[in-house]
Curated annotation (Swiss-Prot):
InterPro entries: Cramped-like (IPR055315), SANT/Myb (IPR001005), SANT_dom (IPR017884). It is found in: Nucleus. The keyword DNA-binding applies. This is Protein cramped-like. It comes from Homo sapiens. Residues 1-165, 450-541, 581-666, 757-827, 976-1034, 1055-1092, 1115-1157 are annotated as: Disordered. One of its GO terms (molecular function) is DNA binding. The lineage of its organism: Eukaryota, Metazoa, Chordata, Craniata, Vertebrata. Belongs to the cramped family. Residues 757-767, 774-806, 982-1002 have a biased composition (Polar residues). PANTHER family: CRAMPED PROTEIN, PROTEIN CRAMPED-LIKE. GO terms for cellular component: nucleus. The gene is CRAMP1. Keywords: DNA-binding, Nucleus, Phosphoprotein. Residues 59-74 have a biased composition (Pro residues).
Length: 1269
């Protein structure tokens, strides 16, 4: 009944379509592929002939026949086709296996192909092409012959093609392509073509895309009748997924037992599909068949394609990648910073390196001095069992960057490093490490995405691995198996995933299985978290402390106090469960309760540390107590879980076993990694390449580091022998001693921390003090000590108590508020702000963390950044800064420029260095004084008057020589200018010039107080009184102050200062007397203020210089000056010397130059001007006061002060001279010094007579006495 389809194309088409339809009916497929199929196949002759008969004897055409439901064109043909495909018995299938058909496969252009035969072939043998006209009976042999003839025809004329026959090799190749590419016919065909090409087979034998598609559907239809689609496995799957999974499982079964399908094999096929593994008895052997975790199935499990890329093909990565390490928290930052290392680390690493090698490197790089000392001690004395754990109490962990997304990886077989690339090879078949056992553990259905929650197949199937959270979470033994097997390989990936953290498999190197707690914690962690953690409170924490905390563990390398307390506690409560103490909040105050809060924290900390949760306590022992407690509070769930897990790790492990896989989605894995990171153990088998892939091949690897207490790694029996505790205590004490920890400090911290409520204290006082302590504990380090010394200098006296409390030479890096003063009122921020820089830092002069200092900062620097002043690299030391009273920011007005002084603008001094300037306070004084002051306190009135006179004259000379004095007359501010100023208290940081009475006459009694030696800072009087000074800049030109009304001085002379005077006023020369030994004509005796000899600074020098015409047109000297009138005497004492009027010319003030000046903006320039009114207010400080806390150095040459020495007390002058000289030495450039020297020489050479004449000519005053006397 074979119907010969004529060669006529239409007949063939009809048959083809019919065949397709029949296939469609048979198949559940419903795919329309058949239509296309038919179209292509239409070119080939179909043999319906065989069909009817085949119905009788041929194997049923496998539903897999690609025919799609195309409408039947010839009803008889359609019917025949249907009969053929549906009726042909399976028994005949094998007969199609003959390889002979292979040749005919593609070649046969004319020979119609029996679909039934092909279908059968799909199951076992090749399909032989059947001659188009061949009767069914002879179809087989004739088909072969025809096949070959068809091949010839095909080559000669490609009009017809014979139905291809599929040899076993072809089928094997097809299934390989199917495993790899899934339902991608073109990719499968390319795979086959490539294989044939390699083997040198003719292109005619290569199956084309349509043939591949047909074979796919024929095979599928063949097996659909055996698949139980009602099973839960198939319910949630799309039809394409069912096909793919069914065909892949069938292909696996076919490999082992052949493609013959009978009831028995059908059952096994269903089992394989639904469970993922089955056992088949074949030829006397039991064969274990597992669903392959091939790429195609992974795509099903991981529709997002997370694992797609990495699976089969080796991934080529760059050889090296930049890596950036940042501290995970303040504790980590402080630890590295305290070592004078940069907490941010960038380096280029080779991807084939293990993460553990990176950790080891960092561990050595950032090893604490204390650790080295400890090692030495342990080598010598602590050889016993305890010593080893002690060393590892706090371990370095790396964590993925905060913003990176983590993707679990499939099992990595190996990472190969070559010259060009770093290549990551996946485990065979792209199988996840755990897949082997996991696959069975989880039914394929789940793998396929029924449990899509799991994430990538590897993540899912390999849950244990990626889900290491479940981490071996006690998977059932089989799972455990899988874990182990995968664990062996997976440790790498596991750690890589980090989710596994090696925890995934108890075997994982990270934690020896023996330590249930270690693994348990992880294992349990998931379950425990699910169960316990959420419900538990820290108080309720199971006693993780069952293992008494390791003191070492707790001992924060950084904070001596907690360590000390902990050690004491250890002694006190050696066998008690600390957790209990902590929970109740009742701690046994090791130090008489003072430390109780801290102790608590440590305890909880310990618990946390001990708890496998190490990560949650991450702050770990090393962290400040507050951090610990905070962690406890924050991560109570985790810690609790973990702690709880340790409590019952084994049980948890067992229980979670089944569910962990499901519980561990990729997100969970990522979270786990973020919580636990990688340490030396967990990352031993993890390469940076895996981390790189997990993070999605970023341009640079961003990792964070922290030190976590591996207490969890040390699950110790609940009660350790008391002897052990004692030993530990002793070792702790040794360590403390070795690290030079100051117990007093600890006590202070204790009391402080105790004072505050535990939570509050943790946040505020505890953290700061703890951190401070931590930092200070590093004292042994030399550089640190230096830093501390610097900081100590920096500490204001108020901070002194603090510093004394922190006796350790090293200063705390963090200024959490004065630790001793009471950190409670400090910001209380959780994170201390680093104040002290590493020893080599050029900011070594940072402001020291004294409470008072902070207050003053805040008060004074409200609107101004305090750092402008403090962080500038300045030589001067702000030792006495704390003395400074709150500074008032003064408004500075621009003086009205007077017409004649266009170029004198240079007379502003930029006080960038001055402490005041940063704050925006107006200060006409040379900041140089501050330096001097910092360098050494100025002793008021100590200098001999003659020195003062020296200074004055020297200053004048210097000013003139330096060109500071402008030729243009700058009217000296009238004494009136000083009148408004009330004397500043000695405390005030800025010395004020003693104010003159409003009348503007200087009274001898009013001599300006000298700057208090104690406060070297030169700054503007902080008092608001000064504020007006700026206002005074009434129309005076920038360079020259408006001519002040000449107020009668005591002597009755009005003192219009000559420009030279005014300029000198502006000058703030440092102690010139010290710099230069210049002998100038001595001042007239009457000029000496208050009878002190040579007090008056001869302005004559300046005037001489001016008269010489060096500095512009000569200005008539003020009569007071010439006469040696009181005005000259009224020179304000050095403290007053910084008379507001005086403005240093930029040339004179080194700060004027950008190099030293903080701010060269106009505002700063203007700030340097002082209006006469302000000057008045600024000047008056009682003579006697040493308070001239900060010299207004510039005012040494203050116009009034210089001209009228009278009002200035010699002591003041001496102080000023000294301070100013020091400033000049410190701040002024060498050029200036050399200028002064030159000036001195000139003066010495110059005719004294001429100078005197000048003086006389100007005012007829007595010649200035030689200052050098």
């Amino acid at each position: 009944m074979t119907v010969k389809l004529g060669d006529g194309g239409s007949g063939e088409d009809g048959l083809k379509k019919l065949g397709k339809r029949a296939a469609d009916e048979e198949s559940l497929e419903g795919e329309g592929a058949g239509g296309a199929d038919a179209a292509e196949e239409s070119s080939g002759t179909k043999r319906d002939e065989k069909t009817p008969r085949a119905g009788a004897d041929g194997p049923p055409a496998p539903p897999g026949a690609p025919q799609a439901p195309s409408p039947p064109q010839g009803s008889p043909q359609d019917q025949h086709h249907f009969l053929r495909s549906s009726v042909r018995p399976q028994s005949k299938r094998p007969r199609k296996d003959p390889p002979s058909a292979v040749g005919s496969g593609n070649a046969g252009g004319s020979g119609p192909r029996g679909k039934g035969a092909e279908g059968g072939g799909s199951s076992s043998g090749n399909v032989s092409g059947v001659a188009p006209a061949a009767p069914a009976g002879g179809s087989r042999s004739s088909s072969r012959n025809l096949g070959s003839s068809g091949g010839e025809k095909e080559e000669g004329k490609k009009v017809r093609r014979q139905w291809e026959s599929w040899s076993t090799e072809d089928k094997n190749t097809f299934f390989e392509g199917l495993y790899e590419h899934g339902k991608d016919f073109e990719a499968i065909q390319n795979n086959i073509a490539l294989k044939y090409k390699k083997k040198g087979k003719p292109a005619s034998m290569v199956k084309n895309k349509e043939q591949v598609r047909h074979f796919y559907y024929r095979t599928w239809h063949k097996i659909t009748k055996y698949i139980d689609f009602d099973h839960v496995f198939s319910r949630g799957l799309k039809k394409s997924s069912q096909e793919l999974y069914g065909l892949i499982c069938y292909g696996e079964l076919r490999k082992k037992i052949g493609g013959c399908m009978d009831d028995k094999n059908a059952t096994k096929l269903n089992e394989l599909i639904q469970v993922g593994a089955t056992t088949v008895r074949y030829k006397g052997r039991n064969l274990r068949i597992k669903a392959p975790m091939c790429r195609a199935l992974k795509k099903l499990c991981d529709p997002d394609g997370l694992s797609d890329e990495e699976d089969q093909k080796p991934v080529r990565l760059p050889l090296k990648v930049p890596i950036e390490l940042q501290p995970r928290n303040n504790h980590a930052w402080a630890r590295v910073q305290s070592l004078a290392q940069n907490p941010r680390l960038r380096m280029i690493v080779e991807l084939h390196r293990k993460v553990s090698s990176l950790i080891e490197f960092l561990k050595q790089k950032w090893a604490l001095h204390e650790v080295r000392v400890r090692k030495t001690l342990e080598e010598r004395q602590l050889q016993d069992s305890c010593s080893a754990p002690m060393q590892e109490k706090v371990t370095l962990h790396l964590f993925p960057g905060e913003n990176c997304t983590l993707t679990p990886l499939p099992g990595v077989a190996r990472v190969v490093h070559s010259k060009a690339f770093c290549t990551v090879h996946w485990q065979e078949g792209g199988r996840c490490k755990q897949s082997a056992k996991d696959a069975h553990v989880l039914p394929p259905a789940q793998i396929l995405g029924i449990q899509s929650g799991q994430g990538t197949a590897r993540g899912q199937v390999k849950c244990p691995r990626s889900g290491a959270e479940g981490k071996g979470v006690g998977r059932p033994p089989p799972a455990a198996d899988a874990l182990q097997s995968s664990g062996e390989s997976s440790p790498e990936s596991a750690p890589g995933e980090g989710a596994a953290l090696s925890l995934s498999s108890p075997d994982a190197p990270d934690r020896p299985p023996p330590r249930h707690q270690d693994t348990g914690p992880c294992l349990e962690k998931t379950p425990a978290e699910g169960r316990d953690s959420p419900t538990r409170e820290p108080g309720a924490l199971p006693c993780a402390c069952g293992q008494l905390p390791d003191l070492e563990d707790e001992l924060s390398l950084l904070d001596p106090l907690p360590r000390y307390l902990k050690s004491c506690q250890d002694l006190i409560v050696p066998e008690q469960c600390r957790c209990a103490d902590t929970r109740p909040g009742s701690e046994q105050p090791p130090l008489g309760g003072a430390a109780s809060p801290e102790v608590l924290a440590p305890v909880s900390k310990e618990a946390a540390d001990l708890a496998p949760t190490g990560p949650s306590p991450r702050p770990g022992p090393g962290l400040l107590l507050d951090v610990c407690t905070k962690d406890l509070a924050d991560a109570p769930a985790e810690e609790l879980q973990e702690k709880g897990s340790p409590a019952g790790p084994p049980p948890s492990q067992g229980q979670p076993a089944a569910r962990p896989p499901k519980e561990v989605p990729a997100s969970r894995l990522a979270q786990q990694l973020r919580e636990e990171g990688w340490n030396l153990q967990t990352s031993e088998s993890l390469t940076l390449a895996e981390v790189y892939l997990m993070m999605g091949k970023p341009s640079k690897l961003q990792l964070e580091y922290d030190w976590l207490g591996p207490g969890r790694q040390d699950p110790r029996p609940g009660s350790l022998p008391t002897a052990l505790h004692k030993q530990r205590l002793l070792s702790c004490l040794l360590k403390l001693i070795s690290t030079e920890v100051n117990p007093k400090l600890a006590l202070e911290a204790n009391t402080i921390s105790t004072a505050s409520v535990r939570p509050a204290q943790e946040e505020q006082s505890m953290t700061p003090p703890g951190k401070v302590v931590t930092v200070s504990s590093r004292s042994p380090r030399c550089p640190r000590n230096q830093a501390s010394l610097r900081s100590s200098k920096t500490f204001p006296p108020s901070s002194a108590p603090c510093s004394s409390g922190l006796r350790n030479p090293p200063r705390p890096l963090l200024v959490p508020g004065p630790s001793s003063t009471g950190s409670n009122d400090s910001d209380g921020g959780l994170f201390a702000v680093p104040t002290t820089l590493p020893p080599n830092s050029r900011h070594g002069k940072l402001f020291s963390p004294s409470k008072e200092a902070e207050l003053t900062f805040r008060q004074h620097l409200n609107s101004i950044s305090m750092q402008s002043d403090f962080f500038l690299p300045k030589p001067r030391k702000l030792r006495n800064r704390h003395l400074r009273k709150p500074l008032v920011v003064q408004r500075t007005l621009l003086p009205r420029p007077s017409e004649n002084q266009s170029h004198n603008v240079c007379s502003f001094s930029i006080l960038s260095n001055s402490s005041v300037t940063g704050r925006g306070s107006f200060r006409p004084i040379q900041s140089s004084l501050t330096k001097a002051a910092l360098s050494r306190p100025i002793v008021p009135k100590v200098l001999p008057p003659q020195a003062t006179s020296h200074l004055a004259s020297a200053i004048d000379l210097a000013a003139t020589s330096a060109g500071i004095l402008s030729g243009n007359p700058l009217p000296a501010l009238d004494t009136e200018g000083l009148s408004g100023i009330s004397p500043l208290s000695s405390d005030e940081v800025t010395g004020a010039i003693s104010g003159q009475d409003s009348t503007g006459t200087h009274q001898d009694g009013d001599t300006l107080p000298t700057v208090g030696g104690s406060d070297p800072f030169v700054s503007i009087p902080s008092r608001p009184e000064q504020e007006p000074v700026a206002d005074s800049f009434q129309g005076s030109s920038v360079l020259s102050l408006s001519e002040l009304p000449k107020a009668p001085l005591q002597n009755g002379l009005s003192i219009p200062l000559s420009s030279s005077e005014s300029s000198s006023t502006r000058l703030s020369p440092p102690d010139v007397s010290a710099l230069l030994d210049i002998s100038l004509p001595g001042p007239p005796e009457d000029a000496l203020s208050q009878g002190e000899p040579a007090t008056h600074i001869s302005d004559s020098i300046i005037e001489i210089a001016i008269s010489s015409g060096q500095y512009g047109e000569g200005v008539p000297l003020s009569p007071a000056k010439l006469n040696g009138s009181d005005s000259s005497k009224s020179l304000p004492s050095p403290s007053s010397s910084p008379q507001p009027h005086w403005i240093a010319s930029p040339t004179h003030d080194p700060q004027w130059y950008p190099s030293d000046s903080t701010d060269s903006s106009l505002s700063s320039l203007f700030a340097s001007f002082i209006s006469p009114e302000k000057s008045r207010k600024m000047l008056p400080t009682p003579i006697g006061t040493n308070s001239g806390t900060s010299l207004l150095g510039p005012s040494l040459l203050d116009g009034n002060s210089r001209d009228s020495f009278v009002s200035r007390s010699l002591a003041d002058v001496a102080e000023v001279v000294d301070s100013q000289l020091v400033c000049m030495m410190n701040e002024n450039s060498i050029d200036y010094i050399s200028r002064f020297n030159d000036l001195a020489q000139e003066l010495s050479i110059a005719e004294p007579g001429r100078r005197e004449a000048l003086f006389d000519g100007g005012g007829g005053g007595p010649a200035v006495s030689d200052l050098s006397q």
